[in-house]
Amino acid sequence: MSPNPTSEFKQIIEQQSEKILNPIERTKVTQDLSENVILTTVDDLYNWARLSSLWPMLYGTACCFIEFAALIGSRFDFDRFGLVPRSSPRQADLIITAGTITMKMAPALVRLYEEMPEPKYVIAMGACTITGGMFSSDSTTAVRGVDKLIPVDVYIPGCPPRPEAIIDAIIKLRKKVANESIQERGTVLQQTNRYYSTTHKMQATEPILTGKYLQSATRQAPPKELLEATGMPVPPALLTTKQKEEI
């Protein structure tokens, strides 16, 4: 015997009425819930967005900037880290001090750093930026460490560092950004100087090039044999100087 058609009809009407009253069905908890839901915090989301879009400012004062320029090329391609070079400090949140910082350039560097919006970061690139480098012993205009002017987050030693070293510094900076909190935004943490000037212990020696070779007789006048071979007459001025030397 066939089932009662009236009961089936009633069930269909009840199902349709439930869909009309509740068009959205109740969510069913499945075993794949842990794979479909991401639990995070505002700090993690905020830090992830910042570390994935660090915008460095195009700034260089010496030969280290050549290595930084190579990093922009297709071989190393730092765009894959989300880095977009900017020419304005108001659009940058990272400055890489590539090269020697002199006393004359120091006020301009501090002004560029102050014009950058918070939060901002600094990477000191090269020995000349960190300690003054080869100019730290006898130069009167080189700054012995850029951290005397602005706080530094990551140091890259080398003369000059390779592009791979810059990538490693950026990765370390990304790890530092990932551990920050949104509550610290806008607070300027005063960093102590990690490098300081000391008197060097190098012994002064006599210079090799004294300039006396410019006063040698062979540079003042060509050899006599050369003049006789070429048939050139000896200038009278040179003859008088030779006579004075003999006297």
From Swiss-Prot:
GO cellular component entries: plasma membrane-derived thylakoid membrane; respiratory chain complex I
Cofactor annotation remark: Binds 1 [4Fe-4S] cluster.
Membrane topology designation: Peripheral membrane protein
InterPro entries: NADH_UbQ_OxRdtase-like_20kDa, NADH_UQ_OxRdtase_20Kd_su
Compartment(s) of residence: Cellular thylakoid membrane
Record's function text: NDH-1 shuttles electrons from an unknown electron donor, via FMN and iron-sulfur (Fe-S) centers, to quinones in the respiratory and/or the photosynthetic chain. The immediate electron acceptor for the enzyme in this species is believed to be plastoquinone. Couples the redox reaction to proton translocation, and thus conserves the redox energy in a proton gradient. Cyanobacterial NDH-1 also plays a role in inorganic carbon-concentration.
Protein name (record): NAD(P)H-quinone oxidoreductase subunit K
